[in-house]
Amino acid sequence: MSGLLPVDLRGSPSMGGDRNHQRDDGSSEEPTILQASDIGRKEDEKEFDYEKGSDKGPDKWGEIHEEWSTCKHGNMQSPIDLLHERVQVVSHLGRLQRSYKPSQATLKNRGHDMKLSWEGDAGSIQINGTKYELKQCHWHSPSEHTVNGKRFDLELHMLHETPSGKTSVVGIMYKIGRADSFLSTLTDHLEALSDSSDQERDVGVVDPRHIKIGSRKYYRYMGSLTTPPCTEDVIWTIVNKVRTVTREQVNLLRVAVHDDSGSNARPIQPINRRSVHFYRPRVEDKN
């Protein structure tokens, strides 16, 4: 089972007390994507940090601006620990339906992470019969989500939105090992940003199909953006398979940001009464 999140979920109970706004968790709709950042007030990257005890740290995000109060008072916040005792195994959610395509992109240092944004149509995913358009991806180290308390070395978030502003994010976890081929294509651009004061760089055409997922299994739950304004009602899909990345690639993502911080991972948030589902295809669906 090397490279897979450890899952033995048969007979796991469903979390009770679903809220109405958890409409997507128990439905028979298609999977979702992790979209995590540009809703409501666009965060000023210098206005918050990840330092424990800092006046701008995660415990204080909800007090910095009124528009960020959900970071403190929300009850569907992300990330969470994907504890197997809470997870209900389902087979009706269906495979992730991705229809990505190459498009012009830019790489931007947001002060707390590196964000790759597609300027044109980079394709979409289908979630619950709705098309979510791929907007950007960014990285957190170490991972923000945990599995049975285990934190991984890196987490990629692929942010998708509908024209009406609904958000879905797909998260992919990484452990130290062989190089990630998608990050390898961005190495020269990351190094260029780390060696200069530039905050943004045109990286030409980038094909999101080169982001490897490698598993049909995934977790799904309703949560929030993991950075201010911590907007809720985000559909999260966390891919079951753990990919690999080199330590040098993880370090480069941090060095290029110039924030002198060893982490940009938000602490784990209370799950409250939310449901967490784990999609596992039926035997007849595997072909």
Where are the regions that the model predicts?
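Alpha-carbonic anhydrase
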Residues: 1-287
